Amino acid sequence: MLDYDALVDQALQLLEQNINKNYRVCIGIIGPPGSGKSTVAEKLKEKINSRYHDYLAHEHHAEVAVRPLSSAIDLTGDLSVANKELQAEIKAGFYSHVEDNNFKPVQVKESDGSTLIVGRGGLDNAVRIKPLRKEANLSPTKPDIAQIVPMDGFHLSRKHLDHFKDPTVAHLRRGSPFTFDSNNFLQLCKVLSKTCSLDPNYHSTGPETVNEDNTNSLFDNVTNSFIDLPEISFPGFDHAIKDPVADQHTVHKFTRILILEGLYLLLNQENWSLIYDAIASTGAFIFWNIVIDEDVIEQRVAKRHVKSGICLSLEEGIQRFRANDQINGRLIQSQSVRNANKNVKNVYDIRND
């Protein structure tokens, strides 16, 4: 079994080691279908936030302070603004680029001051950057400092799959690399990387190794270096409706540890192949690759297919696993950026049997 406390210690040590130069750090969790990526990410988030909340309660912090940005941050300067024709197409569903891996996301200015980043999946897979709020009290009593960034929300919607040249194959292979808005997920990674690389403008004097005795020193440094950053919202995936839902997740100003979770974070194909470089550019990252026996995940995924209503029997679930999930799981092993790039670092295998 995984030692979650050890993983939490590693995550906090990554934050401690970079607290002087990076506002945020990135942790990537990858693995085949059924390996428990989501569960690992959720437990990691809960345990990190619980430790921080315990610290706040022990230190009697009524609220935490947030400093303004010392200079403006441009998160979308590399993107074109969608013209009127393109905006009209986006509002109508935006299906013309659904299979275009080379489509470059565009930005759309909203009436509320927010900026939408739209890729080939249209509004269903859009990323929203919200304007800074003007309210006087912006500080909750127990903010979360860890946030999950799941890849699932970038599944192309079923309506978008209907517009593939071969919609039957698109639906059958849903969950495969080409059935995601990889364009916009990559763009989200680039945006988040920019926020990671912000100088927190706070220089700690605490130790760089996290253990039970000095975690408070790290949390002191974190609490004294919050910056008023724009909120970044992105889609999640609703298994009940089997489609992405816009603005389901948010990275807020208090987020200091990003937990990216998904099947293709290290896949060496099309847009996926650029994610590692985007995250590595922060200089403050680690990837955990979940290793697990294939017969274990076959049973897990088959049962999940039955429970979700995708399949009517365990036998049918196993057949679906072998026709799609197994293929995708083997793909991320054979086509990993680790196999193609000797300069890849900070990627470690962990078992989750």
UniProtKB/Swiss-Prot annotation:
This is ATP-dependent kinase YFH7. Belongs to the YFH7 family. It comes from Kluyveromyces lactis (strain ATCC 8585 / CBS 2359 / DSM 70799 / NBRC 1267 / NRRL Y-1140 / WM37). ATP binds at residues 31-39. One of its GO terms (molecular function) is kinase activity. Keywords: ATP-binding, Kinase, Nucleotide-binding, Transferase. Its EC number is 2.7.1.-. The lineage of its organism: Eukaryota, Fungi, Dikarya, Ascomycota, Saccharomycotina. It comes from the Eukaryota. The gene is YFH7. InterPro entries: P-loop_NTPase (IPR027417).
